[in-house]
């Protein structure tokens, strides 16, 4: 009788053990919904002037999550969509939004003056910062981030700019962590930022 019980116990335990092993081997849920690019070293030479006239580097925002988007003020759709999305993200974050810095880097420094950025960027959220620099400095930083941009039109002031439309996200420790595709659901972005703020 005892041996029969042992046999039954082993019979039951075997599939349970197998299920446990399968669960252990199953891939874990990704920490982020956005693309995890931890380890990329973009932005080491980031140094521009914000729309208040203050020189800035990424070190100025240590302890905060920093998002960086490259665009221009006369962009007809992509840029306002990106900034509006981040405005929604900030609302979703509530008090935690104070630990986030949204940065808009112009790829049109010839037209986007400091004054124009000061009028444009805070419309979406007064905490957002527009960044400008000399054309060669913008080109250097864009190249560092693997951001493409090119003028299209008559180039005499009547032109648009084709440009990369994703957003880069740095963690509070200053490391580049995520790439967010254009028009991503703000709730997804907010969840990823909350995870970074929580130490992931």
Regions found by a protein language model. Give the residues of each.
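A short beta-strand-turn-helix
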Residues: 46-66, 90
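Bacterial signal peptide processing site
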Residues: 26-29
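N-terminal export leaders
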Residues: 4-13, 17
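Short active-site neighborhood of thiol/selenol oxidoreductases, capturing the structured segment around
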Residues: 58-82, 86
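C-terminal motif of bacterial Sec signal peptides marking the signal peptidase cleavage site
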Residues: 21-24
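Thiol/disulfide oxidoreductase modules built on the thioredoxin-like
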Residues: 137-192
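Short loop/turn microsegments at loop-to-beta-strand junctions
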Residues: 43-44, 66, 164-166
